[in-house]
Amino acid sequence: MPNDSFTGRDVIVFGANGALGHGVAEAFADAGASVTGVGRSQPHADRKLPGVSYVTADVTDDGELAALFADVAAPWAVINTVGGFAPYRPFARLDPAELTSQLNDNLISAALITKHALAALTSAGAGRLVHTASRAGVVSKGSGFAYSVSKLGVLHLVSMAADEVRGTRVTVNCVVPSIIDTPANRAALPNSDHGSWPKVPDIARSYLYLAAPESDLVNGAAIPV
């Protein structure tokens, strides 16, 4: 894909403060996009990327998202890398607060982003919405229920939203990571083979592909990485 394939296009990256979101925002900026990075708070100065404008919003707050989309330039693409994680625990130890938190962080956030993104993209006549699911939503073994079911919900959301926009110039897809090579994951799993883990820059290329103008026939896809 040409390095300037997003020149003149506005892209919103939700979760831009996280390891994945930071890398995805950087990839779009490098490809020529005008990027708005959204986080719950402003990133530290040394994490701010040149060419990325940073704003704050609570992605589980419908009103804050409405205000954000009203304030930013009409986007070509909306990228959602927001997410929380909860480890495996047996059902006998299911924590209702953890379940609620995971549904809020992963599914409610994705649903509200979809609501406002599709309104903006359909109003513009074309565009791309790309979510982030997880292999845990497909393969439940070894996954925490709260996390797994919330990511399964994201996969179903993408399928339903894609059906809704089918036949238009708007598409809805998702990237489905397994493990990602991040400092936090390395710290959590110090004895794993980190060299075999997918790297953020490589995963970011999947978002570029799904958000590209040339990917107009790709709708409802879940790309495993």
Give a label for each model feature.
Residues 167-170, 174-175, 182, 191-225:
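C-terminal helical subdomain
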Residues 17, 25:
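N-terminal Rossmann NAD(P)H-binding glycine-rich loop of SDR-like oxidoreductase domains
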Residues 92-111, 130, 154:
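Catalytic Tyr-X3-Lys loop
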Residues 114, 150:
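Active-site helix of classical SDR
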Residues 134:
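Residue(s) in the substrate-gating loop at a strand-loop-helix junction
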Residues 119, 162-164:
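Alpha-helical segment proximal to the catalytic Tyr-Lys
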